[in-house]
Every structure is written in structure tokens, then in C-alpha cells.
């Protein structure tokens, strides 16, 4: 997801969990 996430396999964003 654009907001970030811990291991979003479907997205291209791998940021911190906000």
C-alpha cells in the first residue's frame, strides 16, 4: 500500500507500519 506496510506482497511499497 502507499501508506506502507510490513511485507505487502501485492504492493510495491515496503515501508514501516504507520
UniProtKB/Swiss-Prot annotation:
Entry keyword set: Amidation, Neuropeptide, Secreted
Gene Ontology terms: biological process: neuropeptide signaling pathway
Which coarse location class applies to the principal site listed for this UniProt protein?
secreted
Q: Which of the residues bear the PTM Leucine amide?
A: 18
Q: What are the protein's GO molecular function terms?
A: neuropeptide hormone activity
Q: Where in the cell is it found?
A: Secreted
Q: Which GO terms describe its cellular component?
A: extracellular region
What is stated as this protein's family in its record? Belongs to the pyrokinin family.
What task does this protein carry out? Myoactive.
Protein name stated in the entry: Pyrokinin-5
Instruction: Please give the organism.
Output: Polyphaga aegyptiaca
Amino acid at each position: 500500500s502507499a501508506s506502507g506496510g510490513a511485507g505487502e506482497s501485492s504492493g510495491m511499497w515496503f515501508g514501516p507500519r504507520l
